[in-house]
């Protein structure tokens, strides 16, 4: 899924192995952006039948999975207000007339102070329930737009909440301490969602 190559020689070795295994398509090569998991962001959007963005929800990824098959999957997300990167993505989606769900993986690059977009997933993300944690049910948006034909207002879903799929102990052990106080507050306030556990 993801290979980190420190130099061109290693890159060529990895590409040779991938193609030797029978992979027939092109590969994407991206600049490696330094920083731990807390430099990641996820932006979930819904664009209506007219290609207008109606919902944006920014998640600050605090921890990702680190198993070989889990790399790139979020484990803990803290909702945060959408910033200037969201405005650019909104303009992009509307310029191309995009319709439906979109999910962007973004990383803050401390080298130049800018956010870098890795990819757009033309679907809901695996961690999509963090949007519900912020108070917005995206299935409801879809029904109101496509089935009921309603005109939807534009919403920035930035209500604070914490989404996690790992045990509390793991979260606090592996997330940098800068975020612990906010995580504890949200847990105490009942503003935490854990989609793998039902009460």
Please identify what each model-predicted range represents:
Residues 2, 6-9, 13, 31-97, ...:
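ATP-dependent carboxylate/phosphate-activation module, predominantly the ATP-grasp catalytic core
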Residues 18-22:
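Soluble sensory domains of the PAS superfamily and closely related sensory modules
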Residues 23-25, 37-41, 100-102:
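Short, basic and Ser/Thr-rich N-terminal targeting/leader segments
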Residues 27, 56, 154-156:
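Short, hydrophobic secondary-structure boundary micro-motifs
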Residues 30-31, 99-111:
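A short glycine-rich, hydrophobically flanked beta-strand micro-motif that places a catalytic Asp/Glu
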Residues 51, 112-113:
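Glycine-biased flexible loop/turn sites that connect beta-strands or occur in inter-domain linkers
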Residues 113-123:
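A short beta-strand motif that forms the metal-chelation/ATP-contact edge
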Residues 144-199:
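Peripheral (often C-terminal) accessory segments that flank ATP-dependent C-N-forming ligase machineries
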């Amino acid at each position: 899924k993801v290979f980190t190559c420190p130099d061109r020689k290693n890159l060529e070795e990895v590409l040779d192995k991938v193609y030797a295994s029978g992979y027939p398509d092109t590969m994407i090569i991206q600049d490696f952006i330094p920083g731990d998991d807390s430099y990641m962001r996820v932006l979930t959007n819904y664009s209506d039948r007219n290609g207008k963005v109606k919902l944006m929800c920014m998640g600050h990824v605090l921890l990702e999975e680190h198993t070989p098959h889990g790399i790139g999957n979020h484990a803990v997300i803290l909702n945060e207000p959408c910033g200037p990167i969201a405005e650019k993505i909104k303009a992009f989606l509307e310029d191309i007339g995009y319709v439906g769900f979109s999910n962007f993986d973004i990383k803050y690059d401390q080298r130049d102070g800018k956010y870098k977009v890795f990819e757009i997933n033309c679907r809901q993300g695996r961690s999509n329930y963090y949007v519900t944690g912020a108070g917005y049910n995206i299935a409801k948006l879809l029904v109101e737009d496509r089935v009921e034909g309603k005109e939807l207002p534009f919403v920035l879903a930035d209500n604070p909440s914490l989404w996690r799929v790992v045990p509390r102990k793991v979260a606090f052990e592996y997330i940098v301490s800068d975020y612990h106080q906010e995580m504890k507050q949200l847990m105490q306030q009942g503003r935490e969602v854990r989609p793998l556990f039902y009460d």
